Amino acid sequence: MSDPVFFQFSTATVIILLVLFYGGTFLLSTFVNEKEESVDGFMVSSGKVGFGISAASMTATWIWAASFYGAAISGYNYGLSGPMHYGFWGALMILFIYPFGLRFRALAPNAHTLAEVMHARHGSGSQLILAVSNLMGSVISLMVNFTAAGALVAVLSPLSFQAGVLIAGIGVLSYTLWSGFRASILTDFAQVVAMMSIAVVIIPWVYFSAGGSEALQAGYDIITEEQADFFSMTAILEQGAPFFVAVLAYAIGNQTIAQRLFAVRQDLIKPTFITATLGYGSIVIGLGMLGLMALMLGIVPHEGDPNNIIPQMASAYLPPVMIALFFVLVIGSLSSTADSDLSALAAIMMTDIYGRNLAKGNPNPRKMLLLGRLTMIVATMAGLILASFALDILVMLVFVGALWGAIVFPVIASCYWNRVTNQAFIWAVLGGLLLFTVVRFELLPMTGVVAGFFEIVAAVGGGVVVGLMAFGFFGRIAGIAVGVIGMAVGIFYFSGFLREYTVLLGSLTAYGASTIICVLLSLLGKEEFDFDVINERVTSFDDDAALAAVRAADQKI
């Protein structure tokens, strides 16, 4: 089957849709504008956000446009199991973070960023490593969302890819700039309600318009045996396992998640994250089925670009009114995450770069707000420039997630184990990144002893991943037991095998190397940290007493 003819809106129609969406979102954000904005309100809504807003914001932030595109690409490439590998593991990682989130919040109820907690635990070195990695991740996330906007506009209108990228960037910045995080979570609520309502209609509409079960049944004749297998090992090793490992790192290393963790009321963390888990999984798996349908209908991605699969399916099988709703759906999803990234970047620059370092214990709230808004402007420009390269979304997701993998164990261990030192944290992250880079870019030939070494390190990483999950939900003994078993199984099965799957090998190597280095250096040290002092060192920026406490804490560190 050849590509169906695209339906395209006129330039005027697309501009009207974008103006209505971003104009309406801007008006909605004015309800939370304050003439004299507070620093804590701008960054985390003073830690008092309720259940409904928090759950919706968490869901909307995790459901970004890349979720739609990535899930569809996965379904198109890997068949029956593709959407499940993307949506299920992504949902599981939202659930995974809440037990650790309870610990982070208990240690530092007034925190603004996770890097700020690391500053109180270790000092500036560890804080800046986490902060810089978060900055890089959020800028790349902006790029991914703006890329999705450009792809959508280019397929559904006469406007260019660059025009779509530019409009999305300016639109998101317009309603986030003044009120920051408070504007982000309020608009998230409206966006997630709209996304869920539209998705429930669009998915079955495409299904029946494409011919329903009869058309898809015929598609079994044109897909491969691996694509027809729900338990395909190719899909597990090339998509499921790498993405599972990557999103685990996202859950810990992404400031947009931490920001909502520190914003929601402390007693509502668990129900908020459970609700977001269910919301994310159901929507993303459903939308990923569009990629599976495209595969079984024999559709070829427009111009060979897999990012075009979802807009291509929508334009081929939906009537104009539904295409307009689909357009709003994707624009809403990318905007809800892009505004979260801007708020996250602002919080990192305000707290971790200025508040805890450049200000030398004497931060000026007005300067912090100005810096936060300037950061949003600069970050938007950077995201727009990077988006112009139109890189593959799924590749970027796996790469950034694996990059953050080196941070996961040192961060979690620092919040539970009093022996972890600043040097152990720093060298663990640097070592993990170095070995990940060697594997991912094949700087050394993955053969013989070299490959065997990395497979052993990756086996340790696999044990760490499953061990941390067990530890979060069932405690230390279960975590250690599951981790050791996971390592043993990994050493047995990975030997001579995992070297063929570079993405997964690199991701697990980052976990394993950072864990080994962190544990060894911590055991060699003699430090025994008192976790009670974290709460004393992490304070609000909104009153004089808190600022005095910040100065005193910084002097201690």
Model region roles, listed by residue range:
Residues M1-I557:
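Membrane-embedded helix-loop-helix hairpins and adjacent transmembrane boundary segments
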